[in-house]
């Protein structure tokens, strides 16, 4: 078994990735492996941006957001000839094992390399929390806290002016950021891809909330639902005659110092990944499920849809309107 191991982060960055990089490197060294850092995701393999980790300041990066080795989306990696080129380059260097940190695209890329003979272990690194068979992904907790802090501040000013705020959060096609931020902040109205409401329906609910004497209303919505957030807010104001503002939380959700939870989660997952590599395992995804670090076949993860939380969305909508 080759002692050279590649480490890469791919797709959208997530707070906690640096903790994963640091602990993967330190764990690899402690087990006698020779870790290599691959910069800018899968594109870094093709561009040969591969350096020995010993030449990189991997200590002390766990407290920083983003990913110190860069990340990118590389749709060309879906082509088999590009995958073959990646295997060729890794083999030339002597890298036989690869740890990938990212979301579903990263998992799919890793699975393809696994099928071509590279030993691959995957860690879930995405703020969207949209990886199957894990309760939490690296970065989700930090992003959630960023959203909660933002909505809490909006609530203060909304209360002062008796306003309605429509807040759009990330999540791609997963509603977890919207759902759990609504739970944490008491957002009166929650709109997700499983609970889409028209401006007329939202306006009626807004009026009902103010009629109960509430000084403000927060509408939390997951991205990729509304064609235009400002127009949606303007329509609510037109229908209710209540001052309504909109806010897209945006890429601040991706940044910031990772929470202690994300740092520890990434560290534990990294240590488990190196344990598996030391056992010459491949094609596995690390998860945090039911309070424990577990493993699943990557094939099973990439072939399953995101878990459903539809009932909880409806329940939170009902509870928060009281």
UniProtKB/Swiss-Prot annotation:
Q: What reaction does this enzyme carry out catalytically?
A: beta-D-fructose 6-phosphate + ATP = beta-D-fructose 1,6-bisphosphate + ADP + H(+)
Q: Name one GO molecular function term.
A: 6-phosphofructokinase activity
Q: In which pathway does it act?
A: Carbohydrate degradation; glycolysis; D-glyceraldehyde 3-phosphate and glycerone phosphate from D-glucose: step 3/4
Q: Which Pfam families match?
A: PFK (PF00365)
Q: Which GO terms describe its cellular component?
A: 6-phosphofructokinase complex
The record's listing under NCBIfam families reads: PFKA_ATP (TIGR02482), PRK03202.1 (NF002872)
For this chain, the family text in UniProt reads: Belongs to the phosphofructokinase type A (PFKA) family. ATP-dependent PFK group I subfamily. Prokaryotic clade 'B1' sub-subfamily.
Q: What is this protein called?
A: ATP-dependent 6-phosphofructokinase
> Origin organism of this chain?
Mesomycoplasma hyopneumoniae (strain 7448)
Please spell out the taxonomic lineage of the organism that makes this protein: Bacteria, Bacillati, Mycoplasmatota, Mycoplasmoidales, Metamycoplasmataceae
Q: Which gene encodes it?
A: pfkA
């Amino acid at each position: 078994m080759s002692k050279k191991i590649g480490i890469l982060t791919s797709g959208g960055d997530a707070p906690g990735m640096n903790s994963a990089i640091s602990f993967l490197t330190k764990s690899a060294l402690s087990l006698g492996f020779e870790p290599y850092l691959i910069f800018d995701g899968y594109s870094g393999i093709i561009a040969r941006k591969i350096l020995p980790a010993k030449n990189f300041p991997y200590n002390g990066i766990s407290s920083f957001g983003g990913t110190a080795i860069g990340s990118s989306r590389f749709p060309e990696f879906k082509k088999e000839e590009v995958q073959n080129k990646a295997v060729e380059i890794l083999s030339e260097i002597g890298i036989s094992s690869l740890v990938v940190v990212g979301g579903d695209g990263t998992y799919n890329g890793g699975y393809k390399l696994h099928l071509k003979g590279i030993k691959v272990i995957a860690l879930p690194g995405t703020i969207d929390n949209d990886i199957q068979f894990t309760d939490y992904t690296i970065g989700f907790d930090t992003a959630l806290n960023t959203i909660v802090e933002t909505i809490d501040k909006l609530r203060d000013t909304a209360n002062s002016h008796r306003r309605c705020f429509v807040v759009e959060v990330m999540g791609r096609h997963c509603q977890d950021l919207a759902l759990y931020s609504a739970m944490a902040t008491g957002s009166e109205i929650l709109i997700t891809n499983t609970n889409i409401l028209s401006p007329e329906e939202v306006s009626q609910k807004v009026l009902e909330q103010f009629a109960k004497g509430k000084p403000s209303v927060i509408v939390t919505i997951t991205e990729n639902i509304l064609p235009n957030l400002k127009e949606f807010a303007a329509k609510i104001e037109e229908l209710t005659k209540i001052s309504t503002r909109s806010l897209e939380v945006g890429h601040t959700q991706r940044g910031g110092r990772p929470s202690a939870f994300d740092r520890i989660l990434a560290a534990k997952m990294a240590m488990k990944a190196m344990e598996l590599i030391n056992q010459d395992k491949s094609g596995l995804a690390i998860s945090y499920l039911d309070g424990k670090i577990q493993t699943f076949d990557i094939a099973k993860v990439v072939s399953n849809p995101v878990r459903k939380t539809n009932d909880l969305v409806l329940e939170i909508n009902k509870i928060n309107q009281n």
